[in-house]
Structures are given as structure tokens and as C-alpha cells.
Amino acid sequence: MTAAAEARRTLHLGAFMRPVSIHTGAWRYPEAYPDANFNFGHIKRFAQRLETAKFDAFFMADHLAVLNTPMEALKRSATVTSFEPMTLLPALAAVTERLGLIATGSTTYEEPFHVARRFASLDHISGGRAAWNVVTTSNPHASLNFGIEEQMEHDERYRRAREFYDVVTGLWDSWADDAFIRDVESGLYFDPARLHTLEHEGQYFSVRGPLNIGRPIQGWPVIVQAGASEAGRQLAAETADAIFASARTLEDGQAFYSDIKTRMEKLGRNPDHMKVLPGCLVVVGKTIEEAQEKRAVLDSGVHYESAVASLSIALGTDASAFDPDGPLPDIPETNTSQSGRERTIKLAAQENLTVRQLAQRLGGYSGLAMVGTPKTIADQMEEWLEACGCDGFNIMFPYLPEGLDDFVDKVVPELQKRGIFRSEYEGPTLRENLGLPRPKNQFFD
């Protein structure tokens, strides 16, 4: 192998599996599994297929509330029921060996001790394959499920998240890697000098510690983030090992990639220690025309009522009262996701879309989509990789199981043939497969 070939960058691939498709019409697609997000047998099969294809990770996002949308829209949604991620992923850990397992943990409605303990447990159960997707929870209806009338202000959620991260990682470092002696003869189970009590006192949390579970196999589970606002980008640059990005064009991807890596350099972090993975809906056909027809059938499954609900979520305001055939009116700022709102307003303006057209796009999928043959899809992925628009992708399958099987059976071999995706896992842990270092213990190393 030449030096150039050895130095060639390769893709990392995650699978976005909650909801089982980002597309609201997916459960209605011909021969799709309409119960795929609440059927363990199906999900087990999906995870095992992803592992066969050498995917880096299975990503299980989470929602802490049924969306408070009109029943005409809600009754058409397949996202009203799904497994709780930290119950599902240990079950998947038992039926897989190398696939990374990423779950969402809210920094707004959880407590650091609970999150630290759960993810440390998952890391041990899985043999070092756990990852924590750090979210501040933008859904304004979630607060009502926790006895809180008003959602926390956007930037304050991120300030709380930063302290939350410090507490969780401090708890993971409670024990030195060699703390547990388990000397049967002397009766000494652990070395007290290798235990650190956190004693954290901050603006949002008071946590004594230590954590009552040994240090995770990976040191820390992989830290994932998905914020795209100014506060979200900065949190990712400071803390994350991977970021799920939203970029509809290569130019957008390059700008985001450069911004995140530059922020890391300014903070003294190695930019190579962050993997930028844009979300990408992939529809595969034998020909480009067949793939486009599949996408058209998929989009035809979106009802206007559910499309308007998706638009309302993106904007953070009720869009059902807007004139469907008029332009998008001025949208006031809200306390939900800032980046999602800005992307939606920009899309409407750039393409001169009516409210109805915009809703249909949001109800289907308005982000990055690659619709074509295995070759043309691989061409696009290779272009993004070589142009520094990404380090890989968080793949969104259009429908299940066919969409997943098409990608695994047809696109992955094409990527492997080009030498831009692995044929075997690099190691047993998610950090090894992502090419990430094991964090040093801040109290003992």
C-alpha cells in the first residue's frame, strides 16, 4: 500500500434509528414495517445487519413528550410510541459484539448522577461501546411531564449542559482504572487511595459522589452532540467526540466542518478528535429514475395535517393557522431549537415556497438526501469526505427494512471497493473504531 493510500481518510457511518425513519410517511411505504419502532424483534435484526455492514454505531434518539399537536396530525404519527433508549440498548448489547450504541440523555430533565451511572453501566455491559448524545431538549412540551410550567431559556439550557457534562465526566473518573484490588487473602476489595469523591458545588448542581460503579471501559463513553446554534456549536467544540450535523449542501457542510474544527483548535483540542457526521437520507435504486420514484412514493405518504405539525415543530410556533397557499409569514423568536427555525425560514426564502410546499418538505425530509444508484451515492459521499464536508454520515433510512437492506447490500460494498469504508472493525470499543483516544483520568493519570 502506498503512503498516499495509507493516509487516505475513510468514512464513519452511524445509523439514525429513532424514529425508525426521519420521514413521517415511512411507516406507510409498501412492505415497510409499520410497527418497526416498537418491535424488538425488528430492531434486533436491524442492529445485527448494521454490525454485519461494519457500521460504527446504532443511534437511538429520544423524546420526553408526545408532541402537543392537533389530534388530526398526531393520529397519523408513528413517533407516539417507542422504546426508552437506556432499556433498549443493553438488550441490543447482548445480541451484538462491535456495534456502537448511542443513546440520548437530557441535561435539562435528568440528573448527572443518573446519567453517569446508566452510561457507565451500558459501557461495561457492552464491552466499551456506549455513547452519550448530550441534548438540552428543545421540545417545549417536555417540561410539563416533569412538573415544570415553563421551559428553560435556550442559552441557559446550554450553560446547565456544560456544568452537567463536567459533573458526569467527574463522576466517571471517581475510580482509578486499577482501584479494584479484590485481594481475597487480605480481604481488601479496593484501594482507598484510588478513589476520588467529587464534592461538586456549582450553579446548577450539588453532587457529592463518588459514582458507585467502576470507571467505564472506554474511560468515558463517547460524547455526542447535535447542537447547531452558537451555544450548541461551542458546547460541541468544548466537549464532544462526535457531532450530528445538519447540512443540506456540500458548501453548508464545509462551512460547518471548518467552524467546528477551528473552534476546537482555539480551545487547544486536536481537531482530529471530533467526527462530524451530517444526517443523510439515502434512497437507493437500480437506476436514478427508480430511486427518484421510490422517493416520490415515500413523499406521497405524508398527510398535510402531519406535515403542518412538522412545520410547527421546526418553527417553534403553531403553523396550522397560516394560509397554506401563501408565503411563510414573519416568525417570532421562540425558546425552542434556534438552528432548526433558522434553517426552515431560510429554505422557504431560498426556494420561494408556500406554507403548504414548505410543510410537505418538512413532513417528508428537507435535509441532505442522496437519491440514486449505489455508484452515484458513493460518488457523493466520497466527494463530501474529500472536500472536508464531513468525517462520515449519520444515515437515515427512508423506510424499513428495505431501505436499510438496500444500503447495507448495495452501497456499503461500493464504499468498501473504493477503500473509503472499513471491511473489518478496528477494535472492540467504539472509541477505537472512531479513531478516538481514551480520556485520561483527571484525578489519577
Regions of interest found by a model, annotated:
Residues 2-22, 155-218, 251-258, 262-383, ...:
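An alpha-helical appendage that flanks or caps ligand/catalytic pockets
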Residues 2-95, 218-221, 346, 441-445:
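N-terminal beta1-alpha1-beta2 module of alpha/beta enzyme domains
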Residues 4, 14-17, 29-41, 48, ...:
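Hydrophobic, small-residue-rich alpha-helical packing segments that form membrane-like cores
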Residues 11-15, 58-60, 99-105, 130-134, ...:
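Hydrophobic faces of well-ordered beta-strands that scaffold small-molecule active sites
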Residues 13, 50, 54, 92, ...:
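Conserved, mostly hydrophobic/aromatic
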Residues 37-49, 225-235, 373-386:
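Short, acidic/polar
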Residues 73-101, 266-267, 407-423:
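Alpha-helix-loop-beta-strand connector modules within alpha/beta enzyme cores
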Residues 381-426:
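C-terminal structured "cap/appendage" subdomains that terminate the fold
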